[in-house]
């Protein structure tokens, strides 16, 4: 008797709870992913014979336009713009490298990166498009840039469009020659979104359950767009 009493009282499970979530507007965007090499916005090179040098040259130092970079026997090298002094050896010619040095003056306050955009994405490329930039030196940091310019025609050899990305680099964290990961954003828009787990796919159709003013769940057909981090874009079907 006791067993039957508890069986009748507790054998039925309560209906599962329903989680109701309001549709919200979110930012959706399409991304073109590519890569390239960082280059200084301005650079100037000077070949100097070692016997000319009167005073040691201070490398990796910031200079202003008009500063003296190097005092030589018969001349002075003057900075034509603000930048950083660097040195590069003539590694390809050992005889020359014994007697000469190559000084670089580089303006790294801004960095540019030339990339090739596949032909299929060319209609979306516009000057000023936002760009996210990453490089291995700071893996978790995202730098911001934009599309600065692009070629007037598509390359027949690569079927791509030469495009220049530019970014501020006042911190000096990105060095010329760094390998950069580029994400160009286009068609950035604010759209209605819902959790992707709330959708029901039946063949080519997508449905959700929408709660009406009487607190009843109505099966509703919707048209979806892109997906982004657990959410799906709703193009039609929800007001």
Outline where the language-model segments fall.
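Acidic, gly/proline-rich low-complexity N-terminal segments at the extreme N terminus
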Residues: 1-35, 39, 45, 124, ...
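Short beta-strand segments of a lipoyl-like beta-sandwich/carrier module
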Residues: 19, 42-64, 75-91, 96, ...
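Conserved hydrophobic positions within beta-strands
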Residues: 23, 36-38, 52-54, 85, ...
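Residue-level recognition of beta-strand microenvironments
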Residues: 41, 56, 88, 105-108, ...
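Short hydrophobic beta/alpha edge segments that flank linear recognition/processing sites
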Residues: 45, 60-78, 94-115, 130-132, ...
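Acidic- and glycine-rich mobile interface elements
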Residues: 54, 166, 205-239
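Structural microfeature recognizing short secondary-structure transition sites
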Residues: 126, 135, 141-207, 230
């Amino acid at each position: 008797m006791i067993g039957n009493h508890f069986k009748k009282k507790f054998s039925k499970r309560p209906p599962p709870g329903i989680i109701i979530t309001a549709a919200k507007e979110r930012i959706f965007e399409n991304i073109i992913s590519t890569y390239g090499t960082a280059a200084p916005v301005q650079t100037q090179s000077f070949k100097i014979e070692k016997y000319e040098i009167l005073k040691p040259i201070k490398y990796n130092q910031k200079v202003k336009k008009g500063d003296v970079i190097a005092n030589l026997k018969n001349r002075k090298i003057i900075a034509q713009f603000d930048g950083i002094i660097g040195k590069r050896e003539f590694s390809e010619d050992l005889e020359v490298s014994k007697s000469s040095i190559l000084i670089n003056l580089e303006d790294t306050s801004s960095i540019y990166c030339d990339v090739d955009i596949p032909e299929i994405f060319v209609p979306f490329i516009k000057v000023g498009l936002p760009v996210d930039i990453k490089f291995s030196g700071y893996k978790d940091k995202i730098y911001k840039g934009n599309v600065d310019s692009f070629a007037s025609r598509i390359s027949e050899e690569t079927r791509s469009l030469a495009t220049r990305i530019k970014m501020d680099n006042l911190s000096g964290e990105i060095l010329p020659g760094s390998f950069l990961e580029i994400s160009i954003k286009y068609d950035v828009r604010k759209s209605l979104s819902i959790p992707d787990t709330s959708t029901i796919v039946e063949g080519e159709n997508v449905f959700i359950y929408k709660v009406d003013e009487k607190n009843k769940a109505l099966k509703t057909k919707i048209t979806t767009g892109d997906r982004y981090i657990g959410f799906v874009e709703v193009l039609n079907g929800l007001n």
